[in-house]
Amino acid sequence: MNTDRRGMGRAGGFALAAAAAAALLVAACGKPADAPKAAAPTPATPAPATTAAHTEGGIDWKDASNDSQIDAAFAAAREANKPVFVYWGAKWCPPCNQVKATLFNRQDFIERSRGFVPVYVDGDSPGAQKIGARFHVSGYPTMVLFTPQGQEVTRLPGEVDPVRYTQVLTLGMNASRPVAAVLADALARPASLGTNDWRLLAFYSWDTDQQQVIDKKRLPATLLALADACPADAPDTAMRLRLKALAAADAKAPPKVDTATRAALVALLGDSARSREQTDMLTNYAAEIVRAASAKSSPERTTLLGAFDTALKRLEADTTLSRADRMQALIAQVDLARIDDPEEAPARPGAKPAARAALPAALVADVREQTSRADREITNGYERQAVITAAAYLLERAGLDADSDALLKANLAKSHSPYYLMSELASNAKKRGDSAEALRWYREAFEKSEGPATRLQWGSSYIAALVDLAPNDESAIEAAAGQLWSEAEKQPDAFYQRSGRALGNVGTKLQAWNKGGAHRAAMKRLQTQLHPLCAAPARSSSERATCEALLTGPAKQST
């Protein structure tokens, strides 16, 4: 479980504390006759929280955690000649809660759900991680649209504005071919694409692609090629593809950005309507875009920072956006204010954090005001899980560590997944060099975590923290690892997807801890304790091999 929190819209890299992002559907590219009519922007209204994550009123969800349930859903889809919409999420994850608070309760989405078979896969249901492997999904949330025959059509962007999400969903439902085929034609025969084809590419969830459509290393260059090939009469769709390319660029080898591209970006930022339509890109990836499009301390960077600052302040004040979206705009302002700060080095036991540049007093005051307001005003449980975790991250990022801790502690009793907030408290303590406090919160977060896959993920984080911050506490490390083996033994999908990565991370961490045989006896005991986990009757031969190699070789998940 990664304790770095970035934008909530980055579902594929989701870990601790994430903030929400939103986007409006961009202007059409290509043949205008193909484009559905756009709805006017409306404020996102949270739904009342329910006790079961998959009982949102009005949507006829089919719960699925095994192949037979998935097969039954596709059989029903074939009989009704409807596509299949698969939602993959978890109770604790902030963007999942944001989707529940602002999308699944909307009447337009509920009505649209009558046109597909909605399948709900809770990552903590027994066997769900095998389903994740079947569909090649990992990050929460991931939403995928399939044909009735089981062919993947597109992956939907969970970070976009709910109104536009429903429009993008409609694009997918009306698509005559999968996005992979559309991409191939776009690169080989761009003139053959219609408006909806270009929009399908622009709004495809590349963050959760899992290399199903394109290799991750080729993504930035491919997105740039798409932006260049997009028809000239659709600048906003082309701009969205270009923003995605800049956001995905390798920071060590950024693409060459010409004067015209920077000018187009500045023009976008200066246009209130057009910039709102790109909200998710501008708020989630502000720092990445600025770094990719300008050199440090250059006049071009100064211009971009000024344009971004104006646009982000405008988005923060836009009450037609959800609280999570506006909070993300404020997070982006802090990110840009710290864009030239040195990267945070991994914390060493007892080490004090590096000094950070002081933020403008007005920005600090705004951070305090907006986070306090969110805490006062939010009553919806889903929205609180999404926004308060983001607010706590924002406070820490702004240098207000004590405020961040106070907010998290005050919300432990209000959260349906307090262990998530505890992990943020642990991360805060680790960053300020308080190893004892960090370990206390990591341990409590693990103890309070719920759900088989979640417990393996949180347990993996606790063990990593022990190895990093208390490497000589052999008994605690051995006890925690032994407990994780015991819990994994009862899970049929322990070596798949997120669970498999969690166990693999533990194996890698313990092998590093034992470098040079420093903890040979403890490792031998842990290897013995692994036997019941590896030898469970339900394990395949590849799973057994993966299990047996956890402490002796490169740890890999079985699939």
Where do the model's predicted regions map?
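Bacterial signal peptide processing site
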Residues: C29-A33
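Thiol-based oxidoreductase modules, predominantly thioredoxin-like and allied folds used
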Residues: W61-D67, W88-G89, R106-A128, Y140
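Conserved redox-active cysteine motifs that mediate thiol-disulfide chemistry
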Residues: W88-F104
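Solenoid-like repeat scaffolds
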Residues: A188-S192, L224-A232, V266-E277, L312-R323, ...
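Generic helix N-cap/helix-start motif at coil->alpha-helix transitions
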Residues: L193-R199, D233-L243, R274-E288, T319-A351, ...
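Residue at a conserved register position within TPR or TPR-like alpha-solenoid repeats
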Residues: A337, L395, A429, L466-V467, ...
